[in-house]
Amino acid sequence: MLWTDCLTRLRQELSDNVFAMWIRPLVAEEVEGILRLYAPNPYWTRYIQENHLELISILAEQLSEGRVRQVEILVDSRPGSILSSSEQPATTTAALQTAPIPQPAKGKREPEPVANTAVSSKSSKKKLLNPQFTFSLFVEGRSNQMAAETCRKVLTQLGASQHNPLFLYGPTGLGKTHLMQAVGNALLQAKPNARVMYMTSESFVQDFVSSLQKGKVEEFKKNCRSLDLLLVDDIHLLAGKEASLVEFFYTFNALLDESKQIILTSDRYPKELTELDPRLVSRFSWGLSVGVEPPDIETRIEILLKKAENSGVDLPRNCALFIAQQVVANVRELEGALNKVVAISRFKGAPIDLDVVRESLKDVLAIRARTISVENIQRVVSEYFRIPLKELVGPKRTRIYARPRQLAMGLARELTGDSFPEIGMAFGGRDHSTVMHACEKVVSLREEDPIFDEDYKNLLRLLQS
């Protein structure tokens, strides 16, 4: 049979995922020199037309020795010929290799009438908003202040072009999801009938593929495109899921065309998402991109104290300081460390003090002792500024050495558990008041001097990587 021969050749030409998901389920019949292929829905036919119909036409003409000179792809509406569930695609990671990126419509469309209710998912794959993720429970600091202020502004100007889409980026565990969902929770509190949907990239892919398998693509589109606010977490994880990316951008363009707000998060700045098509990345930059940095030590302390207060836990400030000095990577690890301290405290039936904290974090302390030390910080700072190590710790007070020295002392205070006197000894035997002054100077310089602040952040990333 001609179609069987075509399938054999297509299997060789296409990836396993594309063949299994899009080609194998097609039903074929030959009528008067025309090979008709039947797909389960319009989306499927459009995909085949845009990506594989030319190849199929060439193969059909060759393998039929000229008998077939035309190939058509149609929606299968023939009685009794609906594809069985066993013939539906099973993979969730098909590659839509060359599908063109949809352009936003030039004119406004009349929005479809929708129910006056907030969108919630019956699917276990799609997450509902976390009621704890509110602005009042979000601890602000220098590292996240701009992101928090921008999210509040979005609420007052929902869908405004200058911040639509809003793209929050930064390493994992820094509160991007909290801020994103805080917008959703605040909108629903102000407008209970608003249609808000939060989903991860994974849940978008799973729900989209499921809609394909069940022939419910139109329902999926309607659910996604009738929103007031769409929140999508970890958008970078759509890389390699090209079929889902194409559908996402139809949704993206439809929502922007109606001035509906979109908020996305990623672990990288949009232009660093090199694994995505540049045309897709450019769309992420249409609105506003805001970075979220790892919290500084003051913010980490406040996060711990607020978390403890909300949980009814008595956490002394000196214990919060100690935890904040040891756990520097992200908020998630910080909260995990606090949970461990609380668990050990309750198990021992003892109040939280430094002994309980040290016992709880002994694994963390052991790892940090092997990785970040004052000596390590000195080496990295001297290499970064290209100055001799002996001058960094030496007595010279010229600016070329004094600024890096102050910066190194500030990093040592933030990243190690060493006391002021211990840090002073490591810097040529300086006394504790000199180290205290250096740390205070670092705080003020970071606020006054953007270049100094950028150097501090760069070194922090180097030391934590």
Swiss-Prot record:
Residues 128-345 are annotated as: Domain III, AAA+ region. Residues 346-465 are annotated as: Domain IV, binds dsDNA. Residues 88-100 have a biased composition (Low complexity). Residues 81-123 are annotated as: Disordered. Residues 88-127 are annotated as: Domain II. Oligomerizes as a right-handed, spiral filament on DNA at oriC. This is Chromosomal replication initiator protein DnaA. The gene is dnaA.
